[in-house]
Each structure stands twice: as C-alpha cells, then as structure tokens.
Amino acid sequence: MATIKSTDDTFETLLKEHKILLNDFWAPWCGPCTQIAPTLEEISEEMKEITIAKHNIDDEPNLPTKYGVRGIPTMLLFKDGELKATKVGATSKTDLVSWLKENI
C-alpha cells in the first residue's frame, strides 16, 4: 500500500478506519522530510499492517498544533486510535522499522 494523504479534516476518519496508523508530519521545503519519504514508501509496501499517512504542515497547520509538533519530520504512531509513540527527525530504515515493531 502506498502512503496516503492526511489532512486536518480527514485525520479522525483515518484513525477510525486504520488499526495502525503512522502519521508523518512534513513539508516540501524540509530536507530531512524529503530524505525519509522514499523509506516511508518502502515500509508502506513491506509492512502492510501499518497505514502510513503524510500530513503537510504548511497546507494543514491545525493538527500539528494539536499534537504539539515543533519540528519535522515528526512521526506519530497510533494503534486503535491511541497515540503509542512519537519519533522526531529522519532516521535509517533499519531504525525506523525497529521502532515500529517495538511499538505495535
């Protein structure tokens, strides 16, 4: 499954529809965000139990504020609608997969 788009308006629906949701807060001008984007695409294909959503903070600023996002990329991992873990900054695929497995 490819990554999907998250918006301020669709986020609550995404939480309800997907058992495990990784919401990536990013912006097009953010170097580390664009660096980690291909890794997130790969993980979305390999770990099909996780839905990965991308939330552009420039276009949709309310949700990042609600969750206290101060730097990007920030990834919030939700399971059954509850926030389970937060990861800030770009990281290697190995580290990201390990973090996901530890928290799901």
Task: State where each predicted segment sits.
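A short beta-strand-turn-helix
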Residues: 3-20, 61
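Hydrophobic beta-strand anchors of alpha/beta hydrolase catalytic cores
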Residues: 22-23, 52, 75
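Conserved redox-active cysteine motifs that mediate thiol-disulfide chemistry
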Residues: 25-39
